[in-house]
């Protein structure tokens, strides 16, 4: 799968290509995304009912998704971040399974890059 096909599954290629000038660089940063720990930190903090650390991890992940135009996952992470910003851990936890599925799909798409 090439980068354009990957973005057909995970986000907005036109937007990311306006920030990163070539597909090799986009691919490199997508590789770094797979090593980012913020999703795992978010999951652990939600499980531990740690609103402060969950917010921090969600906010970090939101920024990473925005910078790489990973809009499918990013939309869910924005909602989770805002619930946590308001201190609503239970609502954030309800939204998490959908985000977790999109994260899995994103990771699978990135793994299939040529």
Question: What are these model-predicted stretches?
Answer:
Residues 1-56, 60-114:
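Two-component system phosphorelay core
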């Amino acid at each position: 799968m090439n980068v354009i096909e990957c973005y057909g599954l995970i986000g907005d290629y036109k937007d990311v290509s306006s920030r990163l000038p070539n597909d090799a660089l986009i691919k490199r940063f997508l590789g770094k995304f797979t090593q980012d720990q913020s999703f795992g930190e978010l999951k652990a903090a939600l499980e531990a009912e740690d609103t402060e650390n969950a917010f921090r991890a969600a906010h970090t992940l939101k920024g990473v998704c925005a910078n790489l135009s990973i809009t499918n996952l990013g939309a869910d992470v924005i909602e989770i971040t805002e619930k946590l910003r308001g201190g609503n851990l239970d609502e954030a936890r309800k939204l998490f399974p959908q985000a977790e599925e999109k994260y899995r799909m994103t990771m699978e798409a990135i793994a299939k890059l040529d």
